[in-house]
Amino acid sequence: MVMAQQQKNAERNDEHTRRNRSPSVDSVSRVQQQSGGFAFYNQQSNHQYQQSHPRRTSFSRDGNTGYYNNHSGNKRQTYNNQRGGRSYNHRGNSNYQQNGEYSGNQGCVPKYHQRNQNYPQLQPKYSYFQPHQRPIFNSTQGYGTYSVRRSSPPSPSALSSSTANSTSNRAPTQPPILLRHAEPASDKNHQGSDHEQNHDPKIHLYRSAGTAPGGYTQCPSPYKQPPPQPPSTPSSSDKRIEQQQAEDWPTRFQHPPPQFRRGQDPMPASIELQHKTANQTMPVDIVQTNQQKTVSSYERAAQFRASASELPTDSVDAKHPCFANERMQSALIGISPQLKTQQQSPGIPIQNEAEASAVMKAMRSFQFHNWPQMSHGSYYPMPYHLENQMRPMKSGDQLPLNQQNHNLSGFPAFVGKSSLVGSSLNTRNSSEADPEEMPRIMEKLDDEVTGADHDKTIDENRRRIHKSQEPRIGTEEKALNELPRKANRRNSSCSSISSVSESSSPSALDESTLTKILPTDNFRGGRGFASPSPPTSLLSEPLSRMDVLSEKIWDYHNKVSQTDEMLQRKLHLRDMLYTAISPVFPLSGLYVVGSSLNGFGNNSSDMDLCLMITNKDLDQKNDAVVVLNLILSTLQYEKFVESQKLILAKVPILRINFAAPFDDITVDLNANNSVAIRNTHLLCYYSSYDWRVRPLVSVVKEWAKRKGINDANKSSFTSYSLVLMVIHFLQCGPTKVLPNLQQSYPNRFSNKVDVRTLNVTMALEEVADDIDQSLSEKTTLGELLIGFLDYYANEFNYDRDAISIRQGRRVERAALAVRPKIHSNSEGDKETPPPSSSASTSSIHNGGTPGIPMHHSISNPHFWRSQWRCVCIEEPFTNSNTAHSIYDEMVFEAIKKAFREAHGELQHNHDLDKLMECEPIKASTTNTGAAVFAATYEGERPLAQQPNTIACASLRVLNSIPVSSGPGHYHYQQQSNQNLSRPQRPGSNQGYQMNNNRGFNGNNQQQHQNRRSFNNQSSSNPGNGSTGPRSSRSNENVRDSSRQQNSQKGSSGVSVSKENVASTTGVPVDKKQQNSNRKDDGNRTKRSPMVQSPEPAKTKSEKTPMASSNVSQ
């Protein structure tokens, strides 16, 4: 009896083990055939979903065993079984779209959650190799599919027998892709094999791209080419297969997985980098092993290059773009001692120690400074062929990676120091530099600084745009210092930084002066870009008051400008945030935008980030809030995050404060606001065009801040609007300094260009313009500042004209203040911006929130007319008014008076100190703001969630109730997940139902029903007189209004606090909106919706203005 029971238990355990282990090749094929190539999993309960019943593709709604079917009311996901992938319901508050449109015949499933790695899943055909996983070779598909669960490779005998027929008559036509197994096999399926006991962990398998499906052969020793096979005549179908494989080969394997990122789990010691293909870049600066040994990525790269030199290259075109890039990478990354004696392959150009020494010398001056600036590094995985998501990030895709050719990588070129002085934009990527000319360039490096050929370069106020030639692989190219330049530039006569005398020599400049002009890192040095430098010399004698004013402007700019150390800290913080966000949005890109990178920032500037999750327009009212809610919930478990605020402005942002040592940096994160990336790209070129642009902007922004006219919450200018005003003055003022880049380079600065192809390091071709260089270069900084104040105080007609840097001139207000059409996909409306893009970017560029409440939109005719009321500053890409926050006539008159007073003061005494010693304008205005959802952490931080609660955590954030904080404004309070499956009861305040379909209600739109109102705390207890927002973290009705505090402890450990920021919107309050949610004895008293407890009604004489707190900038 006991034996029978034991035997039955053993059989049950074997069956359980068989179902949960990684599927073998046969089981994978069987699952693919029966279920269309897909295995479905229950992501909530974190267990394999009906693996034994692959035909069952529907999900049960009972018992929390799977995602529910499509339900438009609760915005849940739906699965698309016909296409073989899952698509998400793009409605309202749902898990944001991660459409996995994979073909059903590839045997793959949607991308798994990064923390949910215990599912045996099949990856797409063109997948990156994850070194912590073990491959499973599917002989019927012709490529390796990978499983998250560790499993041993098939036995060598099985591989050789299964592929002997397919590889016997064909020679490799392309470089093989190495797959190294570093650990002996331990799978139960192979323990009985004769070859398993003697399996050599160093056996390497390689697959040639030209082999037949399943063409894997065993190499007897590492990195040795198998004996050549006799050639055969392939059929027409084989030729088509080979041609397709040849086209796909450079992109067949994507970048390494997120495990390579900084600060991630240490890499296993048994895993080496030999699996990386020749066209991949190094992932990180530091890689750790299990022995806690710190190994530089340069050393690992050198090892990889040494091993890669033994790759078979008989039938490889040495001029292939991938190998052209390989030559540059080999030169930049490092030289291994093994390369000095081994025979060099086409990918290794270093021939002797002299070249190696030259390359190492260049590495000390030119680091990898291009790709990680605006976006995350190229080692983050990206999807490949999804229409509604980001494509795989390749070199050039993300700003500021160079080149749109995806096979080329964005490394800087070797240029002389004189080229860096001549133009801050003169950098090329690796494809533009011939490795053979590098030693010659490096030998001339010192001569270029002190040589007679460059005596006019350092002390010359030359323009920042030079002609460049389009690179071509395999052809002879000229170095940057040999490219044609516009000659006969006159030296600037700006006496504050006047030119060097004829007797002066560039060699006389001391080292400290050269350090300021020639940063060791052109892109990162100093200000994110190498700031355009004026001529370097002492002031001319005798000095005038204008000279002193110009010198003070320049000194102030150098004092407040963003330093290189601050930029590095911001970039490191960006990497930390992306590491935390990528598990939730693994197919996204995180861009640095705004003043931190466009050249106009300082050390106190916030860092603005843009999370791009799709290349389509995103509804900023609804979908963007959902995305930011997910990020807020994710970051609450990160210890380096101190607090978060979700600001529901016109462009919603998530304001993040950090713990030490990053407590002095504030991050404003927005979702899919691509216009911020385009603006950053455009302003980068304007700021680098002439050396006088940045100092002038720095002084104007500081003066406006001290004068109190640089705050959108107080009906004044934003920093972005001030920058556009300075650029417009330099384009249309008495002395023209800047051209119109959008007209001169329409293909470069167009709103149709994909933001992932934007590049801020490529030089622009020289074009003809109407700028008088002789007059422009004589104008000093002091004269430009006085002219700027005079232009906007006396010359500019605010009633008739509008500012437009897109057209490079003053335009009539009537031409711009035309109500645009609602966004359409028709051919005639391609240029019309969508509603989500027409929002002001003030919250992106200066951390502020737009002054007009978010419920206003272009669909409201009154708002569209009112936003052009006072001053019109056209946004260069969306054609909206960036100064729409200035709607108060009294404040606008005070602003114009401030310009007149400043101009008179500076024109009279030329004293910058007195200009800065000004008092704020005296104009009373109601404070404007947006709803704020603040999340602070008190006590112990919530524990990190287990993998089986990841899906539930996302749903908990999605099912948050908006609580009214003013007419048309809502902030969110998390609630229990129990309301998902319960019916909606009148007055229970459990749902997310509103009469209007947009999710937000404006003053003139449909009103809430009383039973659906979010302002009604408890309609089941109407006698309490409470009108404040109801805290619905549980299903109990709050009967005592005194229990409503400013912060309520949530079930997840997050304290949610309300700020009365949006209690005053600056617009008349709709009486119907206030009275619809309140019942009195026939007497309806006007009251702010943000009142938390009942209070006596006030008479008209006792009414006081509604108080509000400022949104911290």
From Swiss-Prot:
Keywords: ATP-binding, Cytoplasm, Developmental protein, Magnesium, Manganese, Meiosis, Metal-binding, mRNA processing, Nucleotide-binding, Transferase. The keyword Metal-binding applies. Signal peptide: none annotated. Residues 451-485, 1069-1084 have a biased composition (Basic and acidic residues). Mg(2+) binds at residues 606, 608. Residues 223-233 have a biased composition (Pro residues). Pfam families: MTPAP-like_central, PAP_assoc. Residues 1-113, 134-175, 205-266, 445-513, 817-854, 966-1113 are annotated as: Disordered. Residues 22-52, 149-172, 492-507, 995-1035, 1044-1061 have a biased composition (Low complexity). GO terms for biological process: cytosolic mRNA polyadenylation; embryo development ending in birth or egg hatching; meiotic cell cycle; mRNA processing; nucleus organization; positive regulation of meiosis I; positive regulation of mitotic nuclear division; regulation of cell division. It catalyses: RNA(n) + ATP = RNA(n)-3'-adenine ribonucleotide + diphosphate. Residues 780-816 form the PAP-associated domain. It is found in: Cytoplasm. Germline-specific. GO terms for cellular component: cytoplasm; P granule; protein-containing complex; RNA polymerase complex; RNA-directed RNA polymerase complex. Residues 60-106, 972-994 have a biased composition (Polar residues). Disruption phenotype: RNAi-mediated knockdown leads to a shorter polyadenylation tail in neg-1 mRNA in embryos. Its EC number is 2.7.7.19. Cytoplasmic poly(A) RNA polymerase that adds successive AMP monomers to the 3'-end of specific RNAs, forming a poly(A) tail. Acts as a regulator of mitosis/meiosis required for progression through meiotic prophase during oogenesis and spermatogenesis and for promotion of the entry into meiosis from the mitotic cell cycle. May act by regulating and activating gld-1 mRNA activity in germline. Required for polyadenylation of neg-1 mRNA during embryogenesis. Belongs to the DNA polymerase type-B-like family. GLD2 subfamily. Interacts with gld-3. In contrast to other poly(A) RNA polymerases, lacks any RNA-binding domain. RNA-binding is mediated through its interaction with gld-3. This is Poly(A) RNA polymerase gld-2. It comes from Caenorhabditis elegans.
